[in-house]
From Swiss-Prot:
Pfam families: Anticodon_1, tRNA-synt_1, zf-FPG_IleRS. This is Isoleucine--tRNA ligase. One of its GO terms (biological process) is isoleucyl-tRNA aminoacylation. The lineage of its organism: Bacteria, Pseudomonadati, Pseudomonadota, Gammaproteobacteria, Chromatiales. CDD domains: Anticodon_Ia_Ile_BEm. Catalyzes the attachment of isoleucine to tRNA(Ile). As IleRS can inadvertently accommodate and process structurally similar amino acids such as valine, to avoid such errors it has two additional distinct tRNA(Ile)-dependent editing activities. One activity is designated as 'pretransfer' editing and involves the hydrolysis of activated Val-AMP. The other activity is designated 'posttransfer' editing and involves deacylation of mischarged Val-tRNA(Ile). It is found in: Cytoplasm. Monomer. Its EC number is 6.1.1.5. It comes from Halorhodospira halophila (strain DSM 244 / SL1). It comes from the Bacteria.
Length: 941
């Protein structure tokens, strides 16, 4: 063999078999930065139609986790694919830099503001801490292979952005959407501040559930409202019974609500007392209290009870029965304890009836010292005391423990309370803002489509947006309040603009250092500064105004917002509401959501479970491209499973794709497209089929990229590399590439097809396997001055002349080959043959199938990779021939035998004409022709 090795065209490439991604990717990243790759892409797409994916800013605190990696990789894949589409698709990363978590970190490190630090020093420490966090996260995001304007990201703490946030507030203020109010808001005692809707998460909790008697004050008034039954008037006290899981809110009770349309009953218990409750909940209520004997003595509609006076169970005041559409029969008694200071629905009902908004609880979650019975107690610690007081007053009908979903602070994981405080709100129902937001939802493409119904329901049902926080690190609500009336200064929008202009140069201190007289003149003594800051969800929610409107090369609305599915209640919603207030339209054309990462068993990631997968560890061990391929392989519309096993399987799939690329590159050694490529008409039919197959696949891949169906692309790519290429085309092609003369039509035809395939494949891979695609690009033949990321989808592919018929022919050939391969594998396992080329195959088929396969002639053996392949009539099949059924039901009988001929040392085929050449007695006839003649002729394969 050694004397003929030099006559073979063996593959050669500098593209390494071992990727060593963890080692090589950082080197490639450094080159990208040195060459300003992102800038090169921008220059290449200048003037093209834009595609804007707006980055939802991650919070600048801590290392990135696997969820961050999923989000950034998805964005990067989409931006790179849109660039291949020909769009100018800039990517400006951002960070959310204000807020409580950073305050807590700085307090731990340096002390509290107003004590160890001045407020200005504290804010400066917060700014420095956030900058450190941004830098750490930036390096990790870049390491993922995410291309963007990393040197000019947007930070909500940039002076210009802080000024922009205040200007956005001024625009909303000017539109009449900002109000003040003493309203109940979610309050975290540990934070010492109100919480946004998105900062509340629901967890299971056990609470004390109590049924409480509110005694009817006027017996005659009750009788006048009720249709009496049975014995009519009964002896004993009459009470309306409420049920609540927050006994601590009873000191703030101001009414009992009933539904106007529900049926209510008066039920007598052993002639000792009468209870009023919803008919539908009667049995359940009495059953949990262990009451078996009772009699219904009256009925009425809820509306009939309106205005009935009741005695508070332990305070010296009377409260009315009021009507509320929010009352349901899902549980409880159908009579709802109403404390306007401790619940949104209670507050709204209270507004209708002019009820006092009572809040006896301070910011630490403890009752004020003047609160009767419960002074100084924490609200949750007060629950047992409330039960004691109720029992001592004879007002407790029943008491039990109740397991239910309860709101918790997302930071502290502690239960929150509803607490009425003076706050600033964006009023959703003034000037049609809620309707505007709902209309905006209709015009957006939601992916998955269930996102539309989800956010629609949230916007319809949500309360006004509380935008104020009683903290220090954030954009100030730059408003002057009149000391007597409490009203904002009539020139507030103009004042905000003046402060914003200063903020551009001085940052937040522009407000805190401001002497009111500088803006108010002689009026300064009549006004005081607001000391609240803005909710961080406002900061990120107005980036359509502070970033998209202001940054050159961007535009509003953005084409796409892409975040986790929790952002329907977070960033998607805050962006929508603020945009509805400012622009009367949605800030995005499309919204794409992804699920959360879980382990292989579907469990959430947690340190306690030991199932956390850190992206940094994966990149250091396997490389970023493996992480990127894993993200692409997952159906991100649901939960995304990750584990070491899953990542190892991903690495195996990566190797198959890399090996396909390496085979193509190795066999394109010495191929110059401008010199050696054949035109479509000159290619062998098998090669034309391969190019056409690639073209058809490219259409599917590009369409999947456009629909953001990345997991489909992964499966298409994997199947193409493993089945179409590795399992068929390239396997068949090897013999022709290696054995025919270097410049023969047979070889150049195959190389031309491989060149077209490689040009397409590298582009398909580029959005996902960015490091590997860039590496492949550098080894492809032909001159390449621009990086792969500036390329567009390959347009050099071509269809078959008679696409349906020719495609069907090769599909049938592959079916036959698969059937033969199974039989060859069986015989290899049984040691009948050593390799496929040791075998000769006889196929016994119908005349129709024989006619279909006829174009291959003697070249059928090259397709089957056997030393001989013959076709016979089905009737001639020997009894022991194996049988296979094709997709259309036709049968193929297969007889395989070990070849009796010698093996050619050059091509390894066994052939009867070995020794026919005196000059090359070891070689088969075709190898003699390829070595000493003009080269063998191939007609089809």
């Amino acid at each position: 063999m050694s004397e003929y090795k030099h006559t073979l065209n063996l593959p050669h490439t500098e593209f390494p078999m071992r990727a060593r991604l963890a080692e090589r990717e950082p080197q490639r990243l450094q080159r990208w930065e040195e060459e300003d790759l992102y800038g090169a892409i921008r220059r290449a797409r200048a003037g093209r139609e834009r595609f804007i994916l707006h980055d939802g800013p991650p919070y600048a605190n801590g290392d990135i986790h696997i969820g961050h990696a999923v989000n950034k990789i998805l964005k990067d894949i989409i931006v790179k694919a849109r660039t291949l589409d020909g769009y100018d698709a800039p990517y400006i990363p951002g960070w959310d830099c204000h807020g409580l978590p950073i305050e807590h970190k700085v307090e731990e490190q340096a002390g509290k503001p107003g004590a160890e630090l001045t407020y200005a020093q504290f804010r400066e420490r917060c700014r420095a801490f956030a900058a450190e966090q941004v830098e750490g996260q930036r390096q990790d995001f870049k390491r993922l292979g995410v291309l963007g304007d990393w040197e000019r990201p947007y930070l909500t703490m940039d002076y210009a952005t802080e000024a922009g946030i205040l200007r956005a507030l001024a625009r909303i203020f000017e539109g009449g959407h900002v109000t003040q109010g003493f309203k109940p808001v979610h309050w975290c005692a540990d934070c010492g501040s109100a919480l946004a809707e998105a900062e509340v998460e629901y967890e299971e909790r056990t609470s004390p559930a109590v049924d409480v008697r509110f005694a009817v004050v006027d017996e005659l008034a009750l009788q006048q409202r009720v249709l009496l039954e049975g014995e009519g008037v009964q002896a004993g006290t009459a009470s309306v019974v409420i049920w609540t899981t927050t006994p601590w809110t009873l000191p703030a009770n101001r009414a009992v609500a009933v539904h106007p349309e529900l049926e209510y009953v008066v039920v007598a218990l052993d002639h000792s007392e009468r209870l009023v409750l919803a008919a539908e909940l009667l049995e359940a209520t009495l059953q949990r209290a262990g009451v078996e004997c009772y009699e219904v003595v009256g009925r009425c509609r809820g509306a009939d009870l309106e205005g009935l006076s009741l005695q508070h169970p332990f305070l010296d005041r009377q409260v009315p029965v009021v009507l509320g559409e929010h009352v349901t029969t899902d549980g409880g008694t159908g009579c709802v304890h109403t404390a306007p200071g401790h619940g949104q629905e209670d507050f709204e009902v209270g507004q209708c009836y002019g009820l006092e908004v009572t809040n006896p609880v301070d910011g630490a979650g403890c009752f004020f010292e003047d609160t009767e019975h419960f002074a100084g107690l924490n609200v949750f610690d007060a629950n047992p005391r409330v039960v004691e007081v109720l029992e001592s007053r004879g007002a407790l009908f029943h008491h039990e423990k109740y397991r239910h979903s309860y709101p918790h602070c997302w930071r502290h994981k502690t239960p929150v309370i509803f607490r009425a405080t003076p706050q600033w709100f964006i009023d959703l129902d003034r000037h049609g803002m809620r309707e505007c937001a709902l209309a905006g939802i209709e015009g957006v493409r939601w992916m998955p489509d269930w996102g539309q119904a989800r956010i629609d329901a949230m916007v319809r049902g949500r309360p006004d947006w509380c935008i104020s926080r009683q903290r220090h690190w954030g954009v100030p609500i730059a408003v002057f309040i009149h000391r007597r009336s409490g009203e904002p200064h009539p020139q507030t929008p103009q004042h905000m603009e003046a402060v914003a202009a200063r903020m551009e140069h001085e940052g937040l201190e522009a407000w805190w250092d401001l002497d009111p007289a500088e803006l108010l003149g002689d009026e300064a003594a009549e006004y005081e500064k607001v000391t609240d800051i803005l909710d961080v969800w406002f900061d990120s929610g107005v980036t359509h105004a502070t970033v998209l409107e202001q940054r050159e090369g961007l535009q509003v609305p953005a084409d796409l917002y892409l975040e986790g599915s929790d952002q329907h209640r977070g960033w998607f919603q805050s962006s929508l509401l603020s945009s509805a207030a400012i622009r009367q339209a949605a800030p995005y054309r499309g919204v794409l959501t992804h699920g959360f990462t879980v382990d292989e068993q579907g469990h959430k990631m947690s340190k306690s479970r030991g199932n956390v997968v850190a992206p940094q560890d994966v990149m250091d061990r396997l490389g970023a491209d493996i992480l990127r391929l894993w993200v692409a392989s997952a159906d991100y519309s649901g939960e995304i499973a990750v584990s070491d096993n899953i990542l190892q399987r991903t690495a195996d799939a990566y190797r198959r794709m890399r090996n396909t690329a390496r085979f193509l590159l190795g066999n394109l050694h010495g191929f110059e497209p401008g010199r050696d490529a054949l035109v479509a008409e000159q290619l062998l039919p098998l090669d034309r089929w391969a190019v056409a197959r690639t073209r058809a696949l490219q259409e599917r891949i590009v369409a999947a990229y456009d629909r953001y169906e990345l997991h489909r692309i992964y499966h298409l790519l994997h199947n193409f590399c493993v089945v179409d290429m590795g399992g068929f085309y390239l396997d068949v092609l090897k013999d022709r590439l290696y054995t025919t003369p270097a410049d023969s039509r047979a070889r150049r035809s195959g190389q031309t097809a491989m060149y077209h395939i490689a040009e397409a494949l590298v582009r398909w891979l580029a959005p996902i396997l960015s490091f590997t695609a860039d590496e492949i690009w550098g080894h492809l033949p032909g001159e390449r001055r621009e990086p792969v990321f500036t390329a567009e989808w390959y347009d050099g592919l071509f269809p078959l002349d008679d696409e349906p018929a020719e495609a069907a022919f090769w599909d049938r050939v592959m079916e036959v080959r698969t059937a033969v391969s199974r039989e060859l594998e069986r015989l290899r396992n049984e040691k009948v043959i050593g390799a496929n080329l040791d075998a000769e195959v006889d196929l016994y088929v119908s005349s129709a199938l024989a006619e279909e396969l006829a174009p291959l002639g003697d070249e059928l053996r090259f397709v089957l990779i056997t030393s001989a392949a013959r076709i016979h009539a089905a009737t001639e099949a020997p009894v022991d021939a194996a049988s296979a059924t094709l997709e259309d039901g036709s049968e193929v009988r297969i007889a395989v035998a070990a070849s009796a001929h010698d093996k050619c040392p050059r091509c390894w085929h066994r052939s009867p004409d070995i020794g026919a050449s005196d000059e090359h007695p070891e070689l088969c006839g075709r190898c003699v022709e390829n070595v000493a003649g003009s080269g063998e002729y191939r007609a089809t394969a």
